[in-house]
């Protein structure tokens, strides 16, 4: 078409022109063009075709590409109504243009491959393939090249554009690409160009047209990827010179664009990015020019206008290009073009509207520069061959060329030959029309944004080889300018080449990176060759990445201002911001890839420049302003693979980034996320690490990214994707390494605190703690309502026993069904139904008292299982006579005769065979029955099989009848075999098991085989998973519970109840004797746990009681796991306070009884003890006492330390059996840890091992530990060290005793008692004393072989001490000794000081030494003459004397009795005297500690008499209590033997010579005096005088009650052995009562007054005894009594020896250990109440009167609680001697037995006395006065 026609073409034509050329960004009439200009970098001309143009239409990268394409389109396309017309016009005007242009372009493409590979080469290749290249193209190119700066453009031939039109990538493709790139409506640039046509004289000249066409080709080849659109547009519009024309027509190398400085190139790059729009606007002008060439409408001012345009340009870029032809062509062109574009801007301002069409020239300059960079390597020769003029220009490398910018260099052809052919075609077309030498193919190639070169990713590519050089090296693949046509183009190459398509923006960038990295880059790329075919399309875009490094930098600088590109936004979407910065599109890509400022592109791995990281993104939206993007790509791109990021960004599978989306994040983001394994959304799109991902081929180098705008077009994206994938392969690590690192960044470290599994926890009550997964730490507490099940659980009348009422069980079963039906009305599962049926059957069984043979039960059970059957039976009429003939076979006469013959002969077997063979089953059955059950069963089975053969039908007759007949016949085994062998039978019975069960069970009464069948059938059902059916079968048979049948009713929760009910029903049978404990133990335990879970702790405790009681009596082996769970449940329930009503909580009731007994004996009433049911009532006092038993004041005592050190030495097993301690025996340091205990536990004797024959009393300064499990073991964290359990008699210990105590050891208290338990075992066991003296507990030693194996009960209670045949473990004794308040013991000590000391000394003398004089002991005893031996608190053997000593230490020491200690005294067999405390020693803070004393007595025993206020009566017999106050003398060993014989071995056998497992009952010998205190102390209760009534539960500790006593599991009472021992020990005999003075109520108080006065000491003594007695009790164990250091009432321990001695002189019972004066003081009784005076005064109280006046320790009244805190009365040890018994009716108190004592109170007075006036009228409670 004519140029005029083109000038006047309608808007459609202009739009089409815009589509291809992207010219006139100013012409907003064409939305596509305008956007193309804005978004498209001039250097990134849409060599890929319209799509590429569209991609360039994006604000930044798109603008570059589009600008270059549009400008080139301006050069090539005339202003016609359509592109086809423009092409035809150009082809007609310049027939040889295409050919010449193609020839030149082939060379240019070589240079273009690196500079404008994605640009012009793709287009030229497409033109070559699609357009007939006119022969005059070469000629025209030469002419255009020779035309230096002539403004006259060579006329473009329409044939060229015809060829363009013939390309598949026409306007439609362009629009498709634009559609993808969000091209906003643009003003039709053609219209504006038409308006400005007259100002373009070159349009009229063919030369001008050719010039512009060639220039357009060059520009397309060199489309700078950097944002030089602006400069190029202005330059093109203002200063199109003949040089430019020549350059345009010639190859890039030959294009003589004026070279410019790098600064100008950078500026040009910036302008290119900015002027992409201008370039686009110029491109239309170029089209106009070409069009004018086609329709010669010469503009006379064309040349002048060109001069004006280049007037500001001092450098003749065309000449410079000619000088530096090659370099300038590739890089120099860009650089030169950039200045030209920069300089023309001023002129452009005046002519911008008219000369916007020249923008493409500017872009073309960049492209030419890019081409020059490329031709430097390959295309130079080609270009020279194509165009002589162009070659020299191309040869001259532009000074601005940069090898580091390979992006700009993109070969226009994949192959040089194709490029030459294409040049020829172009030249031919240019001859016809030189206005637009960039066909749509070229536009496709513009996909790659040139500005990407600046991208730090592109910069590395430049280093590897400038994109120009790279593209030049790979021109063949990238030669075609239409990048979109060749998605295969290498990512690095194609992307680098793409920027050249955007030559305007990329040219400057290409210049810096041109030659160095051109060839090397593409040569290194393994991709170029495979992409060669594709590269023509991508070649243009590929070069932008390297070349555009600078433009990218400039654009990158612009990009930061723009919002980050959305990686998922459409690339075509164009925003005003994007439009405002067209060149920034390229910077998008380049910015991330290249650092700010021109950075030489880093050579990609393999020498190939990687495509721009975010090419597509850049094309999509201006990434330069997105700082995050920049940061993303900055590091990775600069380092190595900038292009990879671009590729990653342009992945065809990744949505195009919107104008606001970060460019290049599209692909790399997803890739990074995939690498990290996190969700794509979690990946930070701005993370620099993500940018390196070039995975998406769609993304190209920064320059390519500009062209990647066109990459939005499917071809471009595909090519870029391919390139990116290849690039990705080349350097995966660099791409993904950073991405992974940065993707890890967004991970929230607190995610684990927010996203967790729900937390669910059952509380002790109805509370459930649950934290749902999505709750934000908000805890909502809701009441757990179990619904119907909770009601069922609460209402269950368990635990069931024989005493339970059957009606309650039946009622519960009915209520259960009601609750379940109401709670789950819609739930009618088979299992629920079966469960209900089981419940009904059990109810019937309970109603029948467990008789499974009861017809009522069987009928009920069968009706429950098969109700319909029984309803039918009832409806059936009674069978009447039948008229039907029998169908049975019958023997004929002959057969009958034969049968008769057999029967007569006795051959019944043959007769049976005859009947069976004849089918006469009646006779056969009868005969077989006579032969026995086996024959009968076989015959019946044969009959059933014959009559009812196996069938597959579901008929009951054929299946059920044979079963019944076989059962009747007793052939049960064959039935089960049939079930197992015949599948149909098994299937039927499993489905109809109810029918089978009911049919058989209904006949259970008549046939004994029914149970056998039901059992077998039940097992068969269970083997097939029908457990409820099995349970029904077993219930019907009355099978006992067994391990295989331990749960009734299946595994549901109802099974807990059903099992217990079934057990209960069976127990109702009189014959039910089987112990079902073990089978149901786990069920009951689970039931108890379930109750505890639901907060029903009381009910749970009842189950625990039952289980514990059963375990006590069972002889079966209980699994340890069950025991462990049971113990845990006990502790759990006891902690909730539900054990008040527990099986051991009943102790309170027992205590009440004991209290009544105390009241009866002592005549005192106990007020209710406060706090006995308080919060801490359940805690054993030992817990608190242990912590407070340390006597700080005794720490520095040497004697104390000596004792502690001696005690710290453990006794070896050798010592235990009389051997001296071995030299290797472990020595326990004061720290309580034995060196050998830890290393060799066998060296230590077990705690419960029987003591050695030579075992010596051990001193436990502290209180004894609790017994059983509650007692801290040495290995327990609560276990005190064993330092105090050493043998004082041991010489080594004596040596140790002199050693200073360890800083870790806690010194034993002075008043500590010696324990007589097994020293060796005690070394292993812990005691409170040891606990006090040692902070570090000793590990429990290994059990020795001599120890007894624990019984089941002991295992259950974890207490081996429960196993003892009168050999009580010390811990048990210690438990009881804990109950005795220290104050009381102190008071006792005071009262019996003398006697105890004497007795102790005697005992020590009696005890033989181990061969080593116990000088230590002697010294201690000599020091402590006034202090008796302390109680053996730890071992439970209480030395009253020692306790008294400790007590006396609290009080002012009375004058020491005459005590002589022989130097041979040895504590080896007796307790060594304890070191007495100094009187000044402050009382212990712990009232419970031994010897601790407070003004108030601590808690008193609720059931025991209150502590005596005013007496320290020697209620506790001395060791030598029988002796008077005379001086102690050596007692003969017999005393010791007797003593030991009376000692309760169950509490301590350490004092016994032989480890006797039991000791004979203690016979209190009056001749010998009160049994030595060590005897009674040996009792488990520590204080002999405090020993409670045998079996009194008060003596038991909570540990014993909780964890079991000796009697069995968690026994709350003393074991039988303990009780028996106590009874034996305290067996009452006549002589035992010598000290017992019952209270006799005198009817005549007046008469009793003098007696009471005279016998007051005896009363005080009895009071003290009663006080001492009252100290023992359950509450004393729990710390409920007041232990204030004052003597407490002592319960009467009948049969227990007393240490009081009746003094004839004083006429009173005195304590030899206490000075008489003191006793006399205290002996004065309070005045009796005023009663009628006695007529007959008595000077000496009679024996009968003594009880009323003298209260012996055993019978002394118990002080009321109020008086317990009063001052302590003085002991009455020095009371008057008892008078000689006078003849009277009353029995002598000394010889009175218990009955006599009890009768004294009710016995009438002496003869002649008045009858008793009141029940207690004569009783005087002295303690209350």
Curated annotation (Swiss-Prot):
It is a peripheral membrane protein. Keywords: Autophagy, Endoplasmic reticulum, ER-Golgi transport, Membrane, Protein transport, Transport. Residues 39-60, 214-226, 272-282, 294-303, 327-338, 500-513, 626-650, 693-709, 1179-1188, 1279-1289, 1344-1353, 1406-1445, 1543-1576, 1651-1674 have a biased composition (Polar residues). GO terms for cellular component: endoplasmic reticulum exit site; endoplasmic reticulum membrane; ER to Golgi transport vesicle membrane. Residues 1469-1485 have a biased composition (Pro residues). The keyword Membrane applies. Pfam families: Sec16, TPR_Sec16. It is found in: Endoplasmic reticulum membrane. CDD domains: ACE1-Sec16-like (cd09233). Residues 391-412, 458-485, 576-585, 710-724, 1227-1239, 1255-1265, 1324-1333, 1459-1468, 1611-1620, 1789-1808 have a biased composition (Low complexity). Involved in the initiation of assembly of the COPII coat required for the formation of transport vesicles from the endoplasmic reticulum (ER) and the selection of cargo molecules. Also involved in autophagy. This is COPII coat assembly protein SEC16. The gene is SEC16.
């Amino acid at each position: 078409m004519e140029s005029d026609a083109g000038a006047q073409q309608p808007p459609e034509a202009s739009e089409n022109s815009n589509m291809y050329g992207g010219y006139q960004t100013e012409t907003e009439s064409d939305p596509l063009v305008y956007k193309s200009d804005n978004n498209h970098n001039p250097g990134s001309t849409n060599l890929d075709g319209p799509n590429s143009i569209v991609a360039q239409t994006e604000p930044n990268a798109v603008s570059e590409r589009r600008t270059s394409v549009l400008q080139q389109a301006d050069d090539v396309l005339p202003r016609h109504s359509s592109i086809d017309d423009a092409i035809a016009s150009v082809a007609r005007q310049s027939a040889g243009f295409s050919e010449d242009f193609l020839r030149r372009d082939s060379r240019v493409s070589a240079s273009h491959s690196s500079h404008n590979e994605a640009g012009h080469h793709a287009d030229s290749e497409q033109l070559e393939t699609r357009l007939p290249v006119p022969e005059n193209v070469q000629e025209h190119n030469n002419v255009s090249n020779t035309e230096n700066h002539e403004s006259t453009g060579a006329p473009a031939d329409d044939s060229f554009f015809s060829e363009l039109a013939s390309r598949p990538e026409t306007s439609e493709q362009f629009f498709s690409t634009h559609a993808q790139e969000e091209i906003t409506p643009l003003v039709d640039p053609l219209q504006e160009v038409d308006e400005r046509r007259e100002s373009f004289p070159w349009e009229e000249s063919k030369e001008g047209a050719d010039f512009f066409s060639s220039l357009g080709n060059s520009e397309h080849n060199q489309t700078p990827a950097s944002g030089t659109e602006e400069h190029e547009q202005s330059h093109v519009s203002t200063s199109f010179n003949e040089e430019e024309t020549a350059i345009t027509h010639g190859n890039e190398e030959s294009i003589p664009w004026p070279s410019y400085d790098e600064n100008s190139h950078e500026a040009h790059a910036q302008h290119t990015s900015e002027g992409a729009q201008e370039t686009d606007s110029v491109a239309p002008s170029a089209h106009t020019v070409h069009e004018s060439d086609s329709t010669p409408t010469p503009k006379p001012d064309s040349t002048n206008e060109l001069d004006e345009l280049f007037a500001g340009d001092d450098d003749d870029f065309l000449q410079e290009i000619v000088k530096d032809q090659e370099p300038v062509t590739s890089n120099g062109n860009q650089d030169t073009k950039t200045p030209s574009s920069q300089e023309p801007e001023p002129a452009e301002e005046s002519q911008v509207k008219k000369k916007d069409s020249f923008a493409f020239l500017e872009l073309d300059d960049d492209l030419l520069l890019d081409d020059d960079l490329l031709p430097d390597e390959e295309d130079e020769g080609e270009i020279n061959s194509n165009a002589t003029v162009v070659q020299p220009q191309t040869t001259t490398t532009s000074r601005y060329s940069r090898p580091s910018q390979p992006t700009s260099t993109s070969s226009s052809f994949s192959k040089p030959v194709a490029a030459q052919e294409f040049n020829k075609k172009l030249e031919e077309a240019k001859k016809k029309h030189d206005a637009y030498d960039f066909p749509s193919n070229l536009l496709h190639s513009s996909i790659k944004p040139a500005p990407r070169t600046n991208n730090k990713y592109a910069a590395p590519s430049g280093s590897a080889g400038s994109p120009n050089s790279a593209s030049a090296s790979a021109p063949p693949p990238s030669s075609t300018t239409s990048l979109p046509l060749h998605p295969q183009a290498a990512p690095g190459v194609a992307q680098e080449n793409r920027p050249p398509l955007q030559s305007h923006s990329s040219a400057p960038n290409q210049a810096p990176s041109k030659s160095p990295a051109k060839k090397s880059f593409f040569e290194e790329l393994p991709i170029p060759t495979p992409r060669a075919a594709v590269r023509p399309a991508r070649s243009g875009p590929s070069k932008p990445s390297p070349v555009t490094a600078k433009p990218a930098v400039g654009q990158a600088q612009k990009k930061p201002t723009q919002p980050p590109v959305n990686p998922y936004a459409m690339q075509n979407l164009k925003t005003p911001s994007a439009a405002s910065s067209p060149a920034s599109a390229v910077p998008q890509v380049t910015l991330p890839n290249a650092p700010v400022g021109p950075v030489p592109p880093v050579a990609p791995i393999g020498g190939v420049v990687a495509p721009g990281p975010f090419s597509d993104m850049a094309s999509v939206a201006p990434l330069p302003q997105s700082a995050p993007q920049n940061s993303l790509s900055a590091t990775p791109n600069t380092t190595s693979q900038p292009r990879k990021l671009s590729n990653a960004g342009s992945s065809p599978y990744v949505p195009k980034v919107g104008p606001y989306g970060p460019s290049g994040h599209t692909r790399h983001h997803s890739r990074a996320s995939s690498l990290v394994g996190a969700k794509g959304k979690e990946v930070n799109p701005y993370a620099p690490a993500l940018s390196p991902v070039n995975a998406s081929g769609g993304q190209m180098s920064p320059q390519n990214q500009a062209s990647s705008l066109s990459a939005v077009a499917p071809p471009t994206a595909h090519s870029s994707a391919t390139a990116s994938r290849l690039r990705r392969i080349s350097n995966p690590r660099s791409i993904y390494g950073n991405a992974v690192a940065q993707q890890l960044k967004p991970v929230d470290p607190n995610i684990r605190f927010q996203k967790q599994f729900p937390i669910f926890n059952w509380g002790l009550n109805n509370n459930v703690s649950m934290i749902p997964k999505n709750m934000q730490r908000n805890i909502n507490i809701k009441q757990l309502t179990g619904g119907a099940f909770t009601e069922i659980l609460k209402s269950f009348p368990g635990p069931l026993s024989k005493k339970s009422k059957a009606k309650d069980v039946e009622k519960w079963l009915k209520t259960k069904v009601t609750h379940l039906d109401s709670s789950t009305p819609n739930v009618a599962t088979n299992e629920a139904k079966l469960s209900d049926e089981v419940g009904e059957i059990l109810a019937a069984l309970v109603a029948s008292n467990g008789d499974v043979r009861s017809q009522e039960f069987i009928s009920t059970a069968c009706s429950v299982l098969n109700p319909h059957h029984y309803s039918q039976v009832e409806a059936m009429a009674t069978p009447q006579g039948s008229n039907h003939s029998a169908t049975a076979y019958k023997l004929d006469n002959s057969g009958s005769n034969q049968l008769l013959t057999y029967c007569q002969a006795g051959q019944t077997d043959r007769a049976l065979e005859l009947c069976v063979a004849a089918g006469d089953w009646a006779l056969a059955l009868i005969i077989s029955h006579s032969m026995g059950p086996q024959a009968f069963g076989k015959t019946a089975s044969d009959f059933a099989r014959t009559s009812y053969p196996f069938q597959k039908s579901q008929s009951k007759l054929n299946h059920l009848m044979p079963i019944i007949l076989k059962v009747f016949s007793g052939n049960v085994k064959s039935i089960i075999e049939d079930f197992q062998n015949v599948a149909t039978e098994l299937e039927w019975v499993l489905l109809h098991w109810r029918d089978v069960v009911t049919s058989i069970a209904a006949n259970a009464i008549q046939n004994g085989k029914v149970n056998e069948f039901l059992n077998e059938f039940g097992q068969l059902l269970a083997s097939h998973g029908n457990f409820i059916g099995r349970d029904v079968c077993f219930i019907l048979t009355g099978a006992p519970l067994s391990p295989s049948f331990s749960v009734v009713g299946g595994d549901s929760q109802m099974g807990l109840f059903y099992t217990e009910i079934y057990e209960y029903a069976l127990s109702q049978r009189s014959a039910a004797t089987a112990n079902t404990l073990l089978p149901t133990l786990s069920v009951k335990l689970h039931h108890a746990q379930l109750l505890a879970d639901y907060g029903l702790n009381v009910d749970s405790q009842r189950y625990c009681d039952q289980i514990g009681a059963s375990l006590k009596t069972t002889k079966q082996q209980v699994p340890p796991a069950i025991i462990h769970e049971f113990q845990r449940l006990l502790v759990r329930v006891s902690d909730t306070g539900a054990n008040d009503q527990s099986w051991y909580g009943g102790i309170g009731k027992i205590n009440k009884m004991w209290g009544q007994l105390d009241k009866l004996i002592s005549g005192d009433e106990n007020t209710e003890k406060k706090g006995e049911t308080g919060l801490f009532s359940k805690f054993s006092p030992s817990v608190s006492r242990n912590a407070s038993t340390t006597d700080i004041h005794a720490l520095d005592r040497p004697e104390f330390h000596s004792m502690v050190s001696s005690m710290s030495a453990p006794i070896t097993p050798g010592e235990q059996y009389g051997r001296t301690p071995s030299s290797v025996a472990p020595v326990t340091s004061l720290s309580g840890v034995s060196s050998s205990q830890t290393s060799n536990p066998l060296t230590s004797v077990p705690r419960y091992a029987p003591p050695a024959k030579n075992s010596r009393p051990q001193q436990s300064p502290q209180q004894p530990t609790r017994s059983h499990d509650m007692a801290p073991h040495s290995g327990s964290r609560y276990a005190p060290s064993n330092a105090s359990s050493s043998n004082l008699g041991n010489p080594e210990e004596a040596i140790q005793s002199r050693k200073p105590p360890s800083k870790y050891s806690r010194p034993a208290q002075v008043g500590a008692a010696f324990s007589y338990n097994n020293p060796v075992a005690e070394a292993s066991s812990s005691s409170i004393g040891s606990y006090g003296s040692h902070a570090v507990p000793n590990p429990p030693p290994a059990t020795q072989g001599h120890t007894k194996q624990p019984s089941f009960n002991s295992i259950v209670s974890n207490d081996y001490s429960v196993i003892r045949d009168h050999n009580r473990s010390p811990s048990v004794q210690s438990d009881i000794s804990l109950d005795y308040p220290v104050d009381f013991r102190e008071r006792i000590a005071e009262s019996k000081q003398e006697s105890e000391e004497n007795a102790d000394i005697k005992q020590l003398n009696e005890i033989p030494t181990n061969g080593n004089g116990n000088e230590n002991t002697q010294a201690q005893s000599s020091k402590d003459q006034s202090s008796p031996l302390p109680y053996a608190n730890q071992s439970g053997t209480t030395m009253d004397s020692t306790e008294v000593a400790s007590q006396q230490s609290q009080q002012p020491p009375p004058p020491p009795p005459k005590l002589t200690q022989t130097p041979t005294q040895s504590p080896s067999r007796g307790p060594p005297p304890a070191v007495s405390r100094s009187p000044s020693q402050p009382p212990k803070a712990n009232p419970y500690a031994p010897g601790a004393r407070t003004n108030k007595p601590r808690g008193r025993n609720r059931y025991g008499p209150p502590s005596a206020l005013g007496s320290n009566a020697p209620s506790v017999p001395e060791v030598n209590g029988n002796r008077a106050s005379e001086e102690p003398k050596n007692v003969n060993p017999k005393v010791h033997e007797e003593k030991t014989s009376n000692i309760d071995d169950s509490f301590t056998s350490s004092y016994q010579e032989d480890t006797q497992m039991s000791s004979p009952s203690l016979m209190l010998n009056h001749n010998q005096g009160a049994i030595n205190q060590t005897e009674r102390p040996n009792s488990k209760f520590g204080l002999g005088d405090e020993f409670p009534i045998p079996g009194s539960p008060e003596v038991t500790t909570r540990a014993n009650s909780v964890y079991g006593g000796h009697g069995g599991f968690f026994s709350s009472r003393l074991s039988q052995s303990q009780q028996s021992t106590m009874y034996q020990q305290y067996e009452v005999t006549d002589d035992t009562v010598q000290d017992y003075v019952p209270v006799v109520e005198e009817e005549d108080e007046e008469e009793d007054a003098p007696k009471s006065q005279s016998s007051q000491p005896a009363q005080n003594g009895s009071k003290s005894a009663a006080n001492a007695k009252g100290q023992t009790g359950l509450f004393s164990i729990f710390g409920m009594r007041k232990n204030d250091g004052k003597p407490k009432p002592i319960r009467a321990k009948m049969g227990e020896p007393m240490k009081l001695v009746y003094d004839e002189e004083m006429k009173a019972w005195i304590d030899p250990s206490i000075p008489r004066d003191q006793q006399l003081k205290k002996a004065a009784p309070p005045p009796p109440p005023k009663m009628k005076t006695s007529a007959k005064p008595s000077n000496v109280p009679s024996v009968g009167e003594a009880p009323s006046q003298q209260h012996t320790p055993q019978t002394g009244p118990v002080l009321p609680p109020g008086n317990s805190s009063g001052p302590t009365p003085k002991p009455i040890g020095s009371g008057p001697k008892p008078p000689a018994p006078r003849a009277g009716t009353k029995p002598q108190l000394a010889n009175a037995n218990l009955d006599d004592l009890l009768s004294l109170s009710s016995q009438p007075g002496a003869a002649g006395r008045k009858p008793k006036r009141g029940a207690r009228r004569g009783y005087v409670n002295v303690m209350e006065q």
